[in-house]
Amino acid sequence: VGFATFYPLEGKKVIELGTGLRTQEQALQEAETFFRALGKEPVRAKDAPGLIFPRILSLIINEAVRSLDEGVAQAEEIDVAMRLGVNYPSGPLRWADQIGLDEVLAVLEGLQQETGDDRYRPAALLKKMVLAGWLGESSGRGFYKYNET
C-alpha cells in the first residue's frame, strides 16, 4: 500500500492510499485503520501517477501560472478568485510558493513523462522562475516576495 500526504501536513485530514495490482484488501483495511487512528481520512486511489490530489492540484497551479504569464490577472487576483470562488484555503500561486516551485515543476514533469499527456507540460514561466532560483517561500521569492532569513 502506497500513500501520499499533502503540504502543509498539519491541518490536512486526508491521506491517499495507492492500491497496486497485488494489494490485498486486508492490507488496505489495516492502513485505513492506522491512518484513522492518526486523525486522517484515507481515500483509495488506483496506483497511478500522481494519485488524486497532486495530479489535480498540479493542473490547477499550472493553469494559474499560465494565466499570470498571459496577463489574464495579477498573482493576487488569481489567488483571491480561487480562494473566494471555490473556497480554497490558499490561492494556487501562494500554495505553489509554499510547496516549492521546484517541487511543483518536478511533479508536472514527472506526470507528463509518466502519462505522455501534454496537459502536464509545465508553464514556461514556472520553468524560468525555477531556473532563476525563485523557488517560493524557501528562497524568499516566488510568485510573491517573502522575508529572507
Placement of each model-derived feature along the sequence:
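Short glycine/serine- and small hydrophobic-enriched flexible loop segments
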Residues: N62-D69
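NAD(P)-dependent Rossmann-like dehydrogenase/reductase catalytic/cofactor-binding core
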Residues: V1-G2, P8-K12, R22-D47, D69-E70, ...
